[in-house]
Curated annotation (Swiss-Prot):
Optimum pH is 8-9. Induction: By light. Binds 1 FAD per monomer. Its cofactor is FAD. Inhibited by cyanide ions. Catalyzes the stereospecific oxidation of D-lactate to pyruvate. Involved in the detoxification of methylglyoxal and D-lactate, but probably not involved in the metabolization of glycolate. Homodimer. This is D-lactate dehydrogenase [cytochrome], mitochondrial. It catalyses: (R)-lactate + 2 Fe(III)-[cytochrome c] = 2 Fe(II)-[cytochrome c] + pyruvate + 2 H(+). SUPFAM superfamilies: FAD-binding/transporter-associated domain-like (SSF56176), FAD-linked oxidases, C-terminal domain (SSF55103).
């Protein structure tokens, strides 16, 4: 059966909709452990409206979510069903070989086995397959789509699915919230897409231990809604639709990483199903352990290439007693970056330090009718007691004034804080609104904090000289910054210019002992930079690990490890 609404899959104004689901569960208490038990008989809900701004931002790019005419043939019938004319060939640095892949027909015997395992939670419907095979939030091209989409409900089903696919050597592509921008959910070799959205239970909450055990399909926003009544929260904040499983797979972070760290710092243990069907527990629930290899960190950031995550134990934090949001303008991005560095060097425990350049502020003004000063802007969030946060705010105001800061504003009341923070939250939406019909190439470089001002200044000079609309958005407290490079996907010249700018920033970051990706992951888009960043020996070690755990190369093929190194 087809699970998704045909209405939302058609070429209509609603084509940006993503399925959003409620927790299919009812709470019950077991001492200090709170368990959400699944409601029997509940199945995947149809597509519904999302309240987040993120789908609206992506919807502004009409080409990002255009669907193929429903009369197009299935990929399993013809490998030319998707247009690959724009794919570029370019030696070992090209992802062309990975994007195209080698298509192999899925045996009928495997589909029969999967139907036995999953009953109705399986579909070969073209619309559903295309929806899962197309990159929802990125410019990366899809040349193949999955032949089958499956929706497991338990770890046992995941184990059986992987074991069956491994027997027939059929590729498996794990699928979470689909908010990744580096092509992580592409299916270059077709195969089976394993959608984890039905596995979204909160299995246990340990309030006194400040940890929670969840299934991979739950979103971080859903989880925090559940945790709020206990005075706890999970402190990572990537894209609104991101699922916990996908966040582990990509080793993501967000604007709060400067205070709470990244995903690798906030996961205590995992359960992972390996390609042969074995279920591996990576660690105990203890806050620290010296027992054996750190399998938890091996899986975090592996992007579905080693197995499928089925259970996550997360470290939680207390909801802060008080917070202050502050905003300040600067004459140059270097001045703003210098203040971010000086703030961190002062020892102040900020929870957020975000930088937006004047082009980004202009986009927000144009898109939302605001009248903000169009200058490089720093945004801070301070948390703690009321007295402590006010003291932090005053110290940072003094630091900013020494670096030509002006128009320093801060807010403590909830509505006022929300209004100030909307400046940052509306940034991506504003870019799409300012360049309708365009796609965004979003960069993700990160450098040691001492090099941030130099990198942003160097990049800003190159961006301003380009004919493309380019904005800067940085997590300035930890050296990570993004640029939104808007380009017309129908213009090869603009695409090449966007790629050139991306290359420039990545190679600049690498020259400063930085990385090509601070939080978005490698996927297909960043593979070409890994050898320069890590060295061939590191890539060969990754290959040996992959070969040992996944000898048939069925797990998310064409991702993470460059094609000239892999099988």
């Amino acid at each position: 059966m087809a699970f998704a609404s045909k209405f939302a899959r058609s070429k209509t104004i609603l084509s940006f909709l993503r399925p959003c689901r409620q927790l299919h569960s009812t709470p019950k208490s077991t001492g200090d452990v709170t368990v959400l038990s699944p409601v029997k008989g509940r199945r995947r809900l149809p597509t519904c409206w999302s309240s987040s701004l993120f789908p609206l931002a992506i919807a502004a790019s009409a080409t990002s979510f255009a669907y193929l005419n429903l009369s197009n043939p299935s990929i399993s019938e013809s490998s030319s069903a998707l247009d690959s004319r724009d794919i570029t060939v370019g030696g070992k640095d090209s992802t062309e070989a990975v994007v195209k892949g080698e298509y192999k027909q899925v045996p009928k015997e495997l589909i029969s086995q999967l139907k036995t395992i999953l009953e109705d939670n399986l579909t070969t419907d073209y619309d559903e397959r295309y929806f899962h095979g197309k990159p929802q939030n990125s410019f990366h091209k899809a040349v193949n789509i999955p032949d089958v989409v499956v929706f497991p409900r338990s770890e046992e089903e995941v184990s059986k699915i992987l074991k069956s696919c491994n027997e027939y050597k059929v590729p498996i592509v794990p699928y979470g919230g689909a908010t990744s921008i580096e092509g992580h959910t592409l299916a270059p070799k077709g195969g089976v897409c394993i959608d984890m959205s039905l596995m979204k239970r909160v299995k246990a909450l340990h309030v006194e231990d400040m940890d929670v055990i969840v299934e991979p399909g739950i979103g971080w926003l859903e989880l925090n809604e559940y945790l709020e009544e206990y005075g706890l929260f999970f402190p990572l904040d990537p894209g609104p639709g991101a699922s916990i499983g996908g966040m582990c797979a990509t080793r993501c972070s967000g604007s709060l990483a400067v205070r709470y760290g990244t995903m690798r710092d906030n996961v205590i243990s995992l359960k992972v199903v390996l390609p042969n069907g074995d279920v591996v527990k990576t660690a105990s629930r203890a806050r620290k352990s010296a027992a054996g290899y750190d399998l938890t960190r091996l899986i975090i950031g592996s992007e579905g290439t080693l197995g499928v995550i089925t259970e996550i134990t997360l470290r939680l934090q207390k909801i802060p007693q008080h917070s202050v949001v502050a905003v300040c303008n600067f004459p140059t991005v270097k001045d703003a970056a210098d203040v971010a560095i000086a703030t961190m060097m002062s020892g102040i425990q900020v929870s957020r330090v975000e930088l937006l350049d004047e082009v980004q502020i202009r986009a927000i003004n144009m898109a939302n009718g605001k009248n903000l000063t169009e200058a490089p802007t720093l945004m801070f969030e301070f948390i703690g007691t009321e007295a402590y946060t006010r003291e932090q705010t005053q110290i940072v105001q003094q630091i900013a004034s020494k670096h030509n800061g002006s128009d320093f504003m801060f807010a403590e009341e909830p509505e006022a804080k929300k209004e100030l923070w909307k400046i940052r939250k509306e940034a991506l939406w504003a870019c799409y609104a300012m360049a309708p019909g365009h796609e965004a190439m979003i960069t993700d470089v990160c450098v040691p904090l001492s090099h941030l001002a130099e990198l942003i200044s160097r990049s800003k000079k190159e961006l301003d000289a380009s004919s493309l609309l380019c904005t800067v958005i940085a997590h300035a407290g930890d050296g990570n910054f993004h640029t939104c490079i808007m380009f017309d996907p129908s213009s090869e010249e603009q695409r090449r210019e966007a790629e050139r700018l991306n290359h420039f920033m990545v190679h600049s970051a690498l020259s400063m002992d930085g990385t090509c990706t601070g939080e978005h992951g490698v996927g297909t888009g960043k593979m070409k930079y890994l050898e320069k960043e890590l060295g061939i020996e590191a890539l060969q070690t990754m290959k040996r690990i992959k070969k040992t755990l996944d000898p048939n190369d069925i797990m998310n093929p064409g991702k993470l490890i460059p094609p000239h190194v892999c099988f």
